[in-house]
Every structure is written in structure tokens, then in C-alpha cells.
Amino acid sequence: MPSLSQKKEEVLKGLLRQEKSLPPKYFYDERGSKLFDQITNLPEYYITRTEIQLYQELLPSLARIIDLKKLCVVEFGAGSVKKIRLILEHLSVEAYVPIDISSDHLNLAAEQLSREYPQVDIFALSADYTKPSELPERFDTYDKLGFFPGSSIGNFEKADAESFLIGTNKTLGTGCRVLI
């Protein structure tokens, strides 16, 4: 999790800009995460619905392309872990690490997912997913697939997107793959 001084610095940076802004990651406390989940279920919000439809159509083919043997999926900005279910249904996933800034919301979602998929080793990591994180040692021997669904990367400034992708590589390690 970002320290208080890091949060202050990021907020001040956004408020001192000519076009004021706040980092979107700070919208997603427990209440914000629940609100976003409700928004994604509205008929007007086509992004989630379209993305899920694309996954349903393309995941069988992607499974053949990805073809990792001992697979750990690391989801950046996991939120309610809604979309990972499609991955779990199509790929032979042995471990799953959802990363999100909203720890309460994340832990609740991960507990529910653990009940649905008891064969998958699930470890919820409460952290700022835009920064590199250290995964527990028990995942060192796994092939890693980074998963960053949605249009979230479109919310990043170019430099922030580049920094995120570099951090993703640091989190996952060499030889990883990423599905965005």
C-alpha cells in the first residue's frame, strides 16, 4: 500500500496541474469498489459486458496460445475478481494472486472465489497495483500470467502506462506473459 506521504504527493501533483485530477486508484475504497461494481452492471456500461463476451469467444484459442504448464495468474486491479472466473474456466490455473488497493473488498471477493475454486491456491495481495509488488516465495516456481482486464490502462498517462508495464514485469519476473 502507498504510504501516507506517497498518497499526499500523488494527490498534490494532480491538484497542482492546470487540469485538476486525482489518481483513479483512490476512488476504489470499499464503497467506491462496490459502486463501480454496480455501475458495470448497468445496461449503459457496455465495456464489461463486451469484454466478457470477447473472453468467452477467444479464451479457448488463447488457452492454446498461452499453454503454460504450472500457471499462476496475477491480476492487477482485481476489484471484485469478476472476470477471473472466465480465465479459471478455460485455463489450467493452479494459483491466483489478485492485487488491489481496496483490501476489504479484495479479501471478501478472494474468500468467495476460494470457496468456488478450492483447487486454486489464492492469495489476495493488498497493494497499489500500479507499482511493483513482491509475490510470496511459494509462487516462485510458477509460470506467471499477468491479467489486466478492462479499459483501465486507458486511464493512465503514457508515462504512467509505461511505468506500470515495467513494474508488471518486475512483479511477474522474466518469462512472464501478460493479457491486457
What are these regions (language model features)?
Residues K69-G79:
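Conserved class I S-adenosyl-L-methionine
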Residues S102-S103:
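Conserved SAM/SAH-binding beta-strand->alpha-helix loop
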